[in-house]
Amino acid sequence: MKKLFLILFSILTLGLFSGCGETKENTPAKKDEIQKVSIQIDGAAVPYYAPMYIAKEKGYFKEQGLDVDFYYAAAAEIVKNVATGNVQFGFPNADSVILAKSQGIPVKVVNTTYQHGLGALIFQKSSGITEPKDLKGKKIGVTSFGSPNYIQLQVMLEKAGMSIDDVKVEIIGTGAIVNALVSGQVDAIMFSMLRTIELKNQGVDVGEIRSDEFLPSYGNVLIVGDKFLNENKDVVSKFNTALNKGIQYIIDGNAKEAVEMSVEKYAPSFKGREEIVTTILDEVFIPYLWQSENTKKNGLGYSDAERWNNSIKVLKEYGVIEKEIDAKELIGNIK
């Protein structure tokens, strides 16, 4: 099972993808010169990437001498393009970066933007589920055996003294998994905690158990290639400064403005959903994803080596990676 899981996870996170353009030589910007850089972001343009958009629209990148272009792709493609220099920065999920580094792909995390993972067990309260031990004999939906959420489910069950054999796992596509919960096809799903608020907003009485309580992990992180970092530490530092300023602007009571701007200029498909997205920023991103005890002590985007190592050990234990790496090889706290 572990071997099959490794193959599936590798296909999902590090499949072969074509580059997004020819590799360009990266040269540091001269004083007062605007340097053009690009970042490839996980998935598609959504208002949850508001800090990036705020940093551009408010001129925070420009203040740092940067002109930033946004591109979007799957996590595996992002890691490869960053490593080869097709783009200077990437914003994939943390698990894909750990997998890439364990396979020798030369990338580093320079901003642990999401201080916690997004995974959660979501259930209808009528199911009788209140804690992990209540899952015995229940139907649990996951998107695939190769998904990070499947690992989260395994760890959650193990911590409760059970195994995957104690539940009935159903594989359901991303577009159908939430409806499967609402319709009663399954008793619970391992999915994104953002859906909890969306369901409550729709009048569905749901609860959640966040997977981070059992498996320390991270969501999206900022990465660069080793070569680019070695030659352009000042550029990386400037990008970090602008990104963190964008996050702080939203934290300081400007979530509504940030969402409205993001939807208008970058994510028009979210038109009409600004209110719920603002609620999600206020209730999940600001207090939980962007901030932690570590960021309070060390600043936004701080990378905790011990916590990263805990995530790496679990991925090794469950066969996601074959070679365990030290977090110090992966992270760099760039000020």
What does each model-identified segment do?
Residues 28-171, 183, 187-193, 204, ...:
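Short, glycine-/small- and polar/acidic-enriched structural segments
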